[in-house]
Amino acid sequence: VNYEKIKISSKEKKIKIDSEQEIITGSFIKSFGADVVKKYLSSSRINDALINISSSTITGLNKRKKFWKVIIEDPDDETKDLFLLKLSNKSISVSGNNNSFISINGENYGHIISPKTGFPGKNKLLAVISSSAFKSDVFSTGLYNFSGCDFIQKINSIDDLEGVLINEKREIFYSENFKDFILENYTK
């Protein structure tokens, strides 16, 4: 987890890492692919589409010229919903440790690692909305380990991002305009 051992050379277009490290691109390649598919469909004059690739979803207008409805599930109980969102020409990416973890001696260890501790992050869920699947995916992982207050400050400072963070105490933190996407809020 020592990012300081990663050397990036823009001039040489190379990345060097320590022999004990690896960079796994699967975390963002799917969202990059979703943006490529969206661009292809758009160039083919297909604007009525919903593209779902794992935890990244891109929406266009549906055939009734209405927004798409997207559900964010409760990270502790997937039979319950937290939000019903309305999205049009946007992407949403949801990150969390609820579905991707390993259990050791009764303790669940998630796949999103805190760069500060080297251990799995404790937040329950983070969802990010953007016009780009790649951007929403990268930020939903990148902001995952932030505290609620730091999350709000950071996400509100970046153009074309809205989101919601649910911490380990199940406290909910919204970006400034996230509420504009909410059709139903089941957390009340």
Walk through the language-model features, giving the residues of each.
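Mature catalytic core of soluble alpha/beta enzymes
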Residues: 1-188
